[in-house]
Structures are given as structure tokens and as C-alpha cells.
Amino acid sequence: MGRVIRGQRKGAGSVFRAHVKHRKGAARLRAVDFAERHGYIKGIVKDIIHDPGRGAPLAKVVFRDPYRFKKRTELFIAAEGIHTGQFVYCGKKAQLNIGNVLPVGTMPEGTIVCCLEEKPGDRGKLARASGNYATVISHNPETKKTRVKLPSGSKKVISSANRAVVGVVAGGGRIDKPILKAGRAYHKYKAKRNCWPRVRGVAMNPVEHPFGGGNHQHIGKPSTIRRDAPAGRKVGLIAVRRTGRLRGTKTVQEKEN
């Protein structure tokens, strides 16, 4: 009988513990309040910091609490072009400037945004990786919905009340520089999670992987596998619609709703 393979060991098990060592905290927008719904609130960028395990830099933005005599520090994902000492405005009536936070319904079509809310008040879920951005495509005032194009290229209809940061996430072009040596990859993934180095299945023994074994490295069976396969066999191309090269050209007509 074979061993428990890598895919099974990584599956459901004990309670997940988040990797928090040296992390600076959760990067998200302000909790929506009366000031943001009806006007705007002003903050100042105090510092731009690096967060281990994250490609994009973070901005420490200090706001005055609208209800108590104190200051509150928020961690925003930094938009490209912001700087320390810059004023950041959050709210319905804020101006359309880089780094400001506005509802997407108030932005003109074609605006580039990042750290976009998927549902009103979730404080930013989409387009958060370094260099990523979403584009506002169109508005529907009757249904109060806005259509946006996500970094993947897919289009999504969201509420016009969802907030977003104006601009592109800083740190773009990070993956253009080659890693070049294993030592850099080691330190990169050590800060993220235990996923490196990744041994190929064909390089393993037969007890450790369905693709292991043989007098030379070959899979020896179809690499496609059905969706309901048992966990110890479910490796390779799982429930794929097609395999092989994409040959020829195909014209895709996009239907604009």
C-alpha cells in the first residue's frame, strides 16, 4: 500500500493557524461610517512599510476619530505614486486622486482602481496584489450596480456602494526580475509558507506518488483524472475540459450587458 501523498497531507485536517510572525497586520480599508457615507474624512500617510510575505508595500494612514478625541492608524495597501506626508481622503465626496477611497458608483467610466470591495463594507477584497488593478466599465443608476473588469480579465457586476482605492497597487514589475538562484527562492518562500522546494511526482518512488517509479521518469498513465477519484489518486490534470496546445485562432465576441 502506498503512503499518504502530498496532496492528502496538505488537505483538511487540524485547525489552520495563520502565519503572523513579523507580519504588520491586516491591510484593509476603514470601516464604513457616517463620515464616509455622507462626506469625507481626511487622513495623512505617516509611513510606507514592507510586509514580509506580501509583494505590495503597505501605507500607515492616520485618521482623527470622528467620535472620540483620539487618532486611529489604518493599514492600507499602498497605491503607486503615494508618498509620506500626503493627505488621503475617504468618502463619497472625496476627489478622484491617487490614493483616495471612493465608492465606485461616483467614479467615471474607465477609472483604474485597486483594493476593491466585493460586497459593501468588506473593506477591500479584489485587486490587492502588487501591480494589480481593476477598471470601472459602466454604471447602471437604476439598479445601483457597477460593472468592473478584474485583473484576471473577467467582468463582474458589483454594488455601486462598494469602495475602492484610486490607482494601481504599488510594487508592479516585481516578478520581472528573475530570482536566479535557489537561495533567494528559499528566503522568499520561508517568509510566506512551507511550499518550497516542490518535488515532481515522476521523480518520486511508486509508494509516494501515482506518477512515481519506472526505469526512466515518465508518468506511465493518463495524467487526466476524474473529479470523484480517491484522494490518493487525485493528482495531475483534475477534471479538465481539454488538454494539449491551443491551436489556431478563435474570435471571441464580448457581450456588453
Curated annotation (Swiss-Prot):
Any matching Pfam family: Ribosomal_L2
Q: Which domain of life is it from?
A: Eukaryota
Q: Crosslink site(s) for Glycyl lysine isopeptide (Lys-Gly) (interchain with G-Cter in SUMO2)? A: K42, K149, K234, K250
InterPro entries in the record: NA-bd_OB-fold, Rib_uL2_dom2, Ribosomal_uL2, Ribosomal_uL2_arc_euk, Ribosomal_uL2_C, Ribosomal_uL2_CS, Ribosomal_uL2_dom3, Ribosomal_uL2_RNA-bd_dom
Keyword set, alphabetical order? Cytoplasm, Hydroxylation, Isopeptide bond, Ribonucleoprotein, Ribosomal protein, RNA-binding, rRNA-binding, Ubl conjugation
**Maturation and modification:** Hydroxylated on His-216 by RIOX1. The modification is impaired by hypoxia.
**Which GO terms are recorded in the biological process aspect for this UniProt protein?**
cytoplasmic translation
Question: Which parts of the sequence are annotated with region: Disordered?
Answer: 207-231
Q: Where in the cell is it found?
A: Cytoplasm
The entry's cellular-component GO terms read: cytosolic large ribosomal subunit
GO terms of molecular function: rRNA binding; structural constituent of ribosome
Residues with (3S)-3-hydroxyhistidine modification: H216
Q: Which SUPFAM superfamilies does this UniProt record tie to the protein?
A: Nucleic acid-binding proteins (SSF50249), Translation proteins SH3-like domain (SSF50104)
Describe, as the record does, how this protein assembles with itself and its partners: Component of the large ribosomal subunit. Interacts with CRY1.
UniProt lists the family membership as follows: Belongs to the universal ribosomal protein uL2 family.
HAMAP family named in the record? Ribosomal_uL2_A
Described purpose of this protein according to its UniProt entry: Component of the large ribosomal subunit. The ribosome is a large ribonucleoprotein complex responsible for the synthesis of proteins in the cell.
This protein is called Large ribosomal subunit protein uL2
Organism in which the protein naturally occurs: Pongo abelii
